[in-house]
Amino acid sequence: KDGLSSNRVNDIFKDSEGFMWFATASGLNRYDGCQMKVYRSHNLDLGPLPDNCVQKVQEDGKKRLWIRTAAGYTIYDSKTESFNRDVHALLWEAGIDGIPALTYIDKNKNMWFYIASKGCYLYIPESQLLYPLLFDAGQLPEGEITDISECSDGVLLVYNTGMIVCLNRDTNK
């Protein structure tokens, strides 16, 4: 009766507090072991989610969830149980100008942002250091990055052409 909001599940994530999060085609679902709570955007301008098609859930070092939808990101703060859709302002504070097409949080809680037509940014929250890896500076091959993941040597950038670039964790090259 109180199951998932959609049978199309795009991502499953367990946060540091033990909640299970299900990114579905019809909202974000949180399971606490007993009940399912569904977050949907009934008004796309004011609701918690920019879009109901939720694609990915990740947790940063401050225990905030970065939620990717078909229309952009929102950040869920578990302390206040509130959503913040102004991701641009948060990134601006870190020195990043642009809206991320992709965000990846690695095992060390470092944050990788892909900004279309610009490149990637590695942000290390612990030291508040920002490393731009930009197309026009020749630091990355130009193209559209469709996924960011991790391997034993570093971080993988997957391009829409099928090209895969591995960035060394220590040198970011």
Report each predicted region and the residues it spans.
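Carboxylate-rich, polar loop motifs that coordinate divalent cations or form catalytic acidic clusters
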Residues: 1-173
